[in-house]
């Protein structure tokens, strides 16, 4: 015999089925992130483009996507693969023309989808006309960027203005400009000078760019790098970080990150979006990239009288790997939800263009379980292209790398590994391009891990994903109460309950088969539930019965390592137009137990 201590932390979201509120389009959306270089090439040059996205819109509709977020397509010298913009109003020719972009916007709307685009306001390319004119000292561009004189060492020598460090370079964030005879600040690459938001003329330029895209019909923006938008005007040295090592981590970034004025800028941009909503009643979304602590996420959301971003990205799952146990997962979810302000909407992301994909952090066998974990949580789901297939990171040789970071500070890694082309079928280059060679090598497993083959396999990651998307649209998921449980060290469970219906999601994060005696810590659960969706590696089939309580002659069911189950008390086939969101203004937050320790006697 053995004794297992189960930690139970329950947060309840309650809602009466007769009181569903019609929520805005973004509040429970499945947003699909497209890295345009890697999604689909339409013209045979080896690089994905706007027409390629249009070609595959019907695939996204079939997948159940609500909105697509397209990463930078702006004109750029591509020193940071589009995050160094040289013209904020034009697509880069490698992606297509303005006509192609307008056709994409039209095609998205025709299919009932929403379109969110990346916006990169912290910096531009040094090849932007603004910078060229600024270095010449020409009005009104003279102070569009952060310029400073050097520190005087002696009569014949000067040094950089202060000790500020570049995130990308790992050395001084100041670069000398011979034409202007001053230094300019760049928190990222030397080719990405920071814009100066203490200049009112620049702020008006940015506002007009937002209006330009809103008039074209985009439904929202994802703001890149908002934490760095403004710097302290005094240019003092930043204090050393006692826990830091070298490079960017060597300093405490008290003067270059999360300045109070950053939040005012987000409010200013949100009010531009509200201008358009006031005209036609259609909400535009402002989301922000945010890797900060939960308290800053709440700040980015503002409040009912000071509107800011509706969605600061929640990347907590991106920083997790195979070391995470059930208690850690539970704590992360609870901590995040508890910091949401009254009007806050929860959102979840586990992959992106900057970080390693799920199967490369947790193992290929974990794909279905991790999709189950995140897809039925309350609020918004962000899906990085290929996540539905279980795409893995690729091995990219040094001579194949395209990412600037991979060539500088972080020599042992590169973001290219998670940016490789989407495999559409098992033909050459996965059907991504007709070119001899794509811009990055496609993963070598494309022959069996591609869209076409997975659509034909009922138990594939893709079809499991589609089944979960369908379940996301039911009343019990969109409106149901939310409770979390730790069944054992490595087994995590949460439930969604609405009236007499319950959905339970159970995942085994560990490396051994575990009993799932869920009824011991969730006494309101029935002793037996039906499998709605199994992970491929679980050993269960749709419709199987799972025993959640230990009875005489019938022990609890078991769950294989790295596998997951979605269990149901009913068929769960009803669709809903509403959404469940973790928001204190519309739900009843009930802390049933802060920490409860149970000793459960289990017969081996």
Model segments located where?
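Carbohydrate-interacting/catalytic domains
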Residues: 2-3, 15-75, 102, 106-108, ...
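Active-site rim elements
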Residues: 193-203, 253-258, 357-365, 371, ...
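Conserved alpha/beta catalytic core and glycan-binding cleft of carbohydrate-active enzymes
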Residues: 112, 126-163, 266, 270-421, ...
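Terminal signal-anchor or tail-anchor transmembrane helices
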Residues: 587-601
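Acidic/aromatic-lined carbohydrate-recognition and catalytic surfaces
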Residues: 17-211, 215, 228-294, 422
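Hydrophobic residues within beta-strands of alpha/beta enzymes
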Residues: 68, 221-223
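C-terminal GPI-anchoring signal of eukaryotic secretory precursors
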Residues: 570-587
């Amino acid at each position: 015999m053995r004794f297992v201590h189960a930690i139970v932390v329950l947060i309840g979201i309650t809602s009466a089925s007769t009181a569903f509120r019609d929520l805005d389009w973004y509040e429970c959306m499945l947003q699909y992130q497209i890295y345009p270089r890697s999604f689909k090439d339409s013209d045979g040059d080896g690089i994905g483009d706007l027409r390629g996205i249009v070609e595959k819109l019907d695939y996204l509709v079939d997948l159940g996507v609500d909105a697509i977020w397209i990463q930078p397509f702006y004109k750029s010298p591509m020193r940071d693969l589009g995050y160094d913009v040289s013209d904020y109003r034009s697509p880069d020719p490698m992606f297509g023309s303005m006509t192609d972009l307008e056709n994409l916007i039209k095609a998205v709307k025709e299919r009932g989808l929403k379109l969110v685009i990346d916006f990169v306001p912290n910096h531009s390319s040094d090849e932007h006309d603004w910078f060229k004119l600024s270095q010449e000292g020409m009005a009104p561009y003279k102070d569009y960027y952060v310029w400073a004189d050097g520190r005087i060492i002696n009569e014949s020598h000067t040094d950089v203005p202060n000790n500020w460090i570049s995130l990308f370079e790992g050395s001084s964030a100041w670069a000398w400009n011979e034409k202007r005879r001053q230094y300019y600040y760049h928190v990222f690459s030397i080719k990405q000078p920071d814009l100066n938001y203490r200049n009112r003329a620049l702020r008006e330029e940015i506002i007009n760019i937002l209006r330009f895209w809103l008039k074209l019909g985009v439904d929202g923006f994802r703001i890149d790098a908002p934490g760095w938008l403004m710097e302290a005007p005094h240019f003092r040295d930043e204090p050393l970080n006692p826990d830091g090592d070298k490079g960017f981590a060597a300093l405490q970034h008290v003067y270059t990150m999360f300045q109070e004025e950053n939040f005012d800028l987000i409010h200013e941009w949100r009010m531009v979006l509200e201008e358009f909503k006031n005209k036609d009643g259609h909400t535009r979304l402002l989301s922000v990239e945010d890797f900060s602590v939960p308290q800053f996420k709440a700040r980015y959301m503002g409040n009912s009288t000071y509107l800011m971003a509706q969605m600061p990205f929640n990347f907590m799952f991106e920083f997790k790997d195979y070391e995470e146990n059930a208690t850690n997962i539970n704590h992360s979810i609870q901590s995040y939800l508890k910091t949401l302000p009254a009007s806050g909407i929860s959102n979840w992301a586990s992959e992106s263009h900057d970080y390693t994909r799920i199967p490369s952090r947790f193992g290929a066998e974990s794909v279905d379980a991790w999709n189950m974990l995140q897809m039925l949580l309350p609020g918004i789901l962000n899906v990085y292209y290929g996540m539905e297939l279980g795409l893995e990171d690729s091995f990219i040789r040094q001579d194949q790398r395209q990412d600037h970071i991979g060539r500088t500070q972080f020599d042992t890694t590169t973001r290219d590994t998670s940016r490789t082309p989407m495999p559409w079928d098992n033909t050459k280059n996965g059907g991504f391009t007709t070119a001899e060679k794509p811009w990055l090598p496609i993963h070598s497993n494309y022959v069996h891990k591609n869209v076409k083959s997975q659509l034909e396999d009922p138990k594939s990651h893709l079809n499991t994903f589609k089944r979960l998307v369908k379940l996301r649209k039911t009343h019990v998921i969109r409106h149901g109460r939310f409770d979390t449980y730790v069944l054992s060290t490595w087994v995590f469970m949460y439930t969604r309950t609405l009236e007499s219906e319950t959905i339970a999601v159970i995942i085994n994060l560990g490396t051994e088969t575990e009993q799932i005696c869920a009824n011991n810590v969730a006494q309101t659960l029935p002793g037996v539930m039906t499998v709605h969706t199994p992970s491929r590696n679980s050993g269960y089939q749709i419709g199987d019965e799972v025993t959640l309580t230990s009875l005489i002659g019938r022990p609890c069911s078991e769950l294989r390592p790295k596998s997951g189950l979605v269990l149901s008390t009913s068929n769960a086939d009803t669709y809903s137009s509403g959404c469940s969101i973790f928001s204190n203004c519309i739900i009843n937050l009930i802390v049933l137990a802060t920490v409860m320790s149970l000793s459960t006697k289990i017969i081996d």
